[in-house]
Amino acid sequence: MLASYASDPLKSRGRLYREIPTSYRNEFERDRDRIIHTNAFRRLQYKTQVFINHEGDHYRNRLTHSLEVSTVARSIANTLNLSSDLAETIALAHDLGHTPFGHAGERALNECMKEHNGFSHNAQSLKILTLLEKRYAAYRGVNLTWEVLEGIVKHNGPISGEVNEYIEEYNSQNDLELNTYASAEAQIAALADDISYISHDLEDSIGAKIIDFNNLAELKYIDQHVFELKSKYKNISSSCLIYEVVRKLMHELITDLLWQTKTNINKEKITHIDEIRNLNYQIVDFTEKTNERIKEIKKFLHERVYKSNRITAISLKCTKIVQGLFKVYMEDVNLLPVNWKIQIDSNNPNSKARIIADYIAGMTDRFAIQEYNQLCSLNFNNI
């Protein structure tokens, strides 16, 4: 049974374009299915999480990461008597707007767009779901419920100060109440993302031999798990050891989050979802001690993994590809597919750059590499 402060699909604020409900799925389940059926969701399979797709078959990509986040979010929401369908749906959609080549690709595209209001993967997720996906005759986008769109835009908290151009444009026709917190389910999706990526980036980095267990000794909290597991299982393999470490880490993070969130709900005497939205802090959270540990792990990953020579070298190549593609398309829009070129508004000075950014952002790693080799390489064998 859902808690009184949960997002109830029967009480949804609805969709921008009214639709008749179905008898066999609630509104959030329907949204989940629509997201899974988008082209953007399928493309996540060939988009970088940390390691480029061709580096190995067992490294996580944006799709496997999104699936893992959704399972964590669903479990947490279930335990708290919140809408697991909404938490799962927001988690599945949270990375739809990512460029090829992960954060390196996003930084490169944002740099290309600095004179055209920049690029944000969060805003791009909204744009994909409300404009760029073309699956239905009656409207553009996939016409998701207000709660899902709110969660995608605000899962990291209220939006204040300068608002992204597309978020502001969409918000003018469907007010997402940008100055408030999102639902507890959206907050769960955001922290499920943190739990998943710090755990699994550690696992993948050990597997890729970017770091080893000696490096993990820098994280006393993690090193203690390593010591205990080695003591218990004398002949444990490295692959099994890191899996067990990550398993323990995820369990402890989830357990901690559940305890602190229940404590917050009880302290604030929460009885309605609007009380969650109007609080002056995030209701779903870790304990202070665990937040500090998470910061340590993120710092470790940043210094030891994301800034490693191997990842840095790959990132430089990826940056060159994204910026190279942007440059050639800006110089000659006839290189764009016709269905993209015709969308350019000659009366809008930002239109060309924005359409090109949308096109590049939707590329998979391998398609971006292929396009770059075709359009930017001096190797005439590519012609």
UniProtKB/Swiss-Prot annotation:
UniProt GO molecular function: dGTPase activity
Instruction: Name its GO BP terms in alphabetical order.
Output: dGTP catabolic process
**What InterPro entries does its record include?**
dGTPase, dGTPase-like, dNTPase_2, HD/PDEase_dom, HD_domain, PHydrolase_assoc_dom
Using the record's annotation, list all stretches that form the HD domain.
62-198
Q: Keywords on this record?
A: Hydrolase
State the superkingdom.
Bacteria
Q: Which family does it belong to?
A: Belongs to the dGTPase family. Type 2 subfamily.
Report the PANTHER family cross-referenced here: DEOXYGUANOSINETRIPHOSPHATE TRIPHOSPHOHYDROLASE-LIKE PROTEIN, DEOXYNUCLEOSIDE TRIPHOSPHATE TRIPHOSPHOHYDROLASE
UniProt cross-references to NCBIfam families, sorted A to Z: dGTP_triPase, PRK01286.1-1, PRK01286.1-5
User: What name does UniProt use for this protein?
Assistant: Deoxyguanosinetriphosphate triphosphohydrolase-like protein
Q: Which organism is it from?
A: Rickettsia bellii (strain OSU 85-389)
Q: What is the lineage of its organism?
A: Bacteria, Pseudomonadati, Pseudomonadota, Alphaproteobacteria, Rickettsiales
